[in-house]
Curated annotation (Swiss-Prot):
UniProt source species: Metallosphaera sedula (strain ATCC 51363 / DSM 5348 / JCM 9185 / NBRC 15509 / TH2)
GO cellular component terms, A-Z: cytoplasm
Family, similarity comment: Belongs to the 7 kDa DNA-binding/endoribonuclease P2 family.
Keywords: Cytoplasm, DNA-binding
MF terms in GO: DNA binding; RNA endonuclease activity
Name the UniProt record assigns to this protein: DNA-binding protein 7
Pfam family, one: 7kD_DNA_binding
Highest taxon listed in the record's lineage: Archaea
NCBIfam families, alphabetized: Sul7d
Xref: Gene3D superfamilies: 2.40.50.40
Assembly and interaction partners: Monomer.
Amino acid sequence: MATKIKFKYKGQDLEVDISKVKKVWKVGKMVSFTYDDNGKTGRGAVSEKDAPKELLNMIGKK
């Protein structure tokens, strides 16, 4: 089963498959990321403590 990242963006609860994540970086205690949203670039952020290990392992990698 693929890992899903659950996060809030502009008041909406969203979920994205980790395979769609493009770039991951850390801002303070938050982990920010961009992902492929059907041809558009989506953005999201999740707290470091709530982030899946797979996402944390992607920090700084392309």
